[in-house]
Design a protein with these regions (language model features):
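A solvent-exposed, acidic/Ser-Thr-rich amphipathic alpha-helical stretch
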Residues: 23-24, 30-83
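Residue-level recognition of short loop/turn positions
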Residues: 32, 97, 113-115
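Short beta-strand edge/turn micro-motifs at domain boundaries
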Residues: 104-133
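Short, low-complexity N-terminal intrinsically disordered segments enriched in polar/charged residues
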Residues: 1-31, 138-157
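Short, surface-exposed coil-to-beta transition loops
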Residues: 69, 100-107
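Acidic surface patches and DE-rich sequence motifs
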Residues: 37, 95, 111
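Structural motif
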Residues: 82-86, 104-106
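Generic short beta-strand segments
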Residues: 34, 88-94
Length: 157
C-alpha cells in the first residue's frame, strides 16, 4: 500500500515537472535536504535551500522550456522513515533553439515520512553537456553560467 502511494506521488511529481511546474517538488522537500544534479555545468551541483533549488528549476525551464520525462521504471524500497526511490527515465526537450534531444537518466530520491531529504539527478552527462554547448553557441549565455549551489546544512558538514 505504501509503495503504491509513493509510486503515484513520484509519477505525479514527474508529470508536474514535465508541465513546467516545479512547485510540487519544492513543497515536497524536507526542512533539510540536498538537491543534486550530476556534472560540472550550468545545471550541475548541489543545493540545500528552497531558494537555490527554486532558482535551479527556473533556470532549467529557461534552458529547456518543454522538458518532458518518460518514466521507464520506478523502484521503491525501505520503511517510511527511510525510503529509497529509484526512477529510470528518458528525458526529451527542444531547448530554446528548437533542436529535439533525448537523454536517459536516473533519479535517486530518499524520503523520510513522505518528505524528500535527497534528490539526486543522474543524467547521461554527455547529452546534457552537448545540449548546453549547443545552446551556448546559439547565444544562450545562461547555458554556460556558473552552477546554482547552496550552502551546506550542518547535517552535511
Amino acid at each position: 500500500m505504501y509503495d503504491a502511494i509513493v509510486r503515484r506521488r513520484v509519477v505525479d511529481l514527474f508529470a508536474a515537472v514535465s508541465n513546467g511546474n516545479a512547485r510540487p517538488v519544492l513543497e515536497g522537500l524536507a526542512p533539510r535536504f540536498e538537491h543534486f544534479f550530476l556534472g560540472d555545468h550550468a545545471l550541475g551541483g548541489s543545493r540545500f535551500t528552497l531558494e537555490k533549488t527554486r532558482l535551479w528549476y527556473e533556470r532549467l525551464y529557461r534552458l529547456l522550456p518543454d522538458i518532458s520525462f518518460d518514466l521507464r521504471a520506478v523502484r521503491i524500497s525501505g520503511p517510511r522513515w527511510n525510503t529509497l526511490v529509484a526512477v529510470d527515465w528518458l528525458e526529451s526537450n527542444s531547448g530554446t533553439d528548437g533542436v529535439r534531444t533525448f537523454t536517459p537518466g536516473v533519479h535517486v530520491v530518499r524520503l523520510a515520512w513522505g518528505r524528500m531529504t535527497y534528490i539526486g539527478i543522474y543524467p547521461d552527462t554527455v547529452g546534457v553537456v552537448t545540449t548546453l554547448q549547443r545552446l551556448s553557441r546559439a547565444g544562450v549565455a545562461e547555458a554556460t553560467a556558473e552552477k546554482i549551489q547552496g550552502q551546506l546544512h550542518s547535517r552535511y558538514r
